[in-house]
């Protein structure tokens, strides 16, 4: 009935006479009461016995309807099946002149160590047997043509690509006039 009304919390529509005047018959005015009486829940419905089970006494742990779980573990004891099948691939180095060492080799990264008593992990297939795009070698000529096509060969000539645009916002910093049609600082 009053779904379309938006009332502030603590106000209610209750057919009550004003405190100083008696009710004027069945057409008593509906007034907004700023505070509800103790027996009403926000003035909208009478408060009776709470529904559902009684709350547990303080100091006890509530387990729900089925009681405590006898085999509760916060984390699964066995890893998911997909986690054991993943093979780690070496990532291409960021330094082109530096060769990568195989895992476990002196000077190279240490490989994953199996847990004591665990069976030895299966050997990884060679890179050429993967059949994926990650294993294909890219021709240097193809890289050079991409570099020229994308304009990456000019990176050394354009310091703003390294420093960011904010250092060259004003052309007065460069010591030359701005190009025609550009916005000045």
Curated annotation (Swiss-Prot):
One Pfam family of this chain: CITED
Biological processes, Gene Ontology terms: response to estrogen
Keyword list, A-Z: Activator, Cytoplasm, Nucleus, Transcription, Transcription regulation
InterPro entries per the UniProt record, alphabetical: CITED (IPR007576)
UniProt feature, compositional bias: Pro residues: 103-125
One cellular-component annotation, GO: nucleus
Location(s), subcellular: Nucleus; Cytoplasm
Region (Disordered): 15-64, 95-130
A GO molecular function held by the record: transcription coactivator activity
Its biological purpose: Acts as a transcriptional coactivator for TFAP2/AP-2. Enhances estrogen-dependent transactivation mediated by estrogen receptors. May function as an inhibitor of transactivation by HIF1A by disrupting HIF1A interaction with CREBBP. May be involved in regulation of gene expression during development and differentiation of blood cells, endothelial cells and mammary epithelial cells.
Family: Belongs to the CITED family.
Assembly mode: Interacts via its C-terminal region with the CH1 domain of CREBBP and EP300. Interacts with all TFAP2/AP-2 isoforms.
Record-given protein name: Cbp/p300-interacting transactivator 4
Lineage, top ranks: Eukaryota, Metazoa, Chordata, Craniata, Vertebrata
Gene name for this UniProt entry: CITED4
């Amino acid at each position: 009935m009053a779904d379309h009304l938006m009332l502030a919390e603590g106000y209610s529509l209750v057919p009550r006479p004003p405190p100083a005047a008696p009710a004027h018959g069945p057409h008593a005015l509906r007034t907004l009461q700023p505070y509800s009486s103790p027996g009403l829940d926000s003035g909208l419905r009478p408060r009776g016995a709470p529904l559902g089970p009684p709350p547990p006494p303080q100091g006890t742990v509530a387990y729900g309807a089925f009681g405590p779980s006898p085999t509760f573990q916060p984390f699964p004891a066995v890893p998911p099946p997909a986690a054991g099948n993943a093979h780690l691939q070496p990532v291409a180095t960021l330094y082109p002149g530096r060769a990568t060492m195989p895992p476990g080799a002196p000077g190279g990264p240490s490989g994953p160590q199996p847990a004591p008593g665990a069976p030895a992990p299966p050997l990884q297939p060679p890179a050429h047997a993967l059949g994926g795009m990650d294993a294909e070698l890219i021709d240097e000529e193809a890289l050079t043509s991409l570099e020229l096509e994308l304009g990456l060969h000019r990176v050394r000539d354009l310091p703003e690509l390294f420093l960011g645009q904010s250092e060259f916002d004003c052309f007065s910093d460069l010591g030359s006039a701005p190009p025609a049609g550009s916005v000045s600082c």
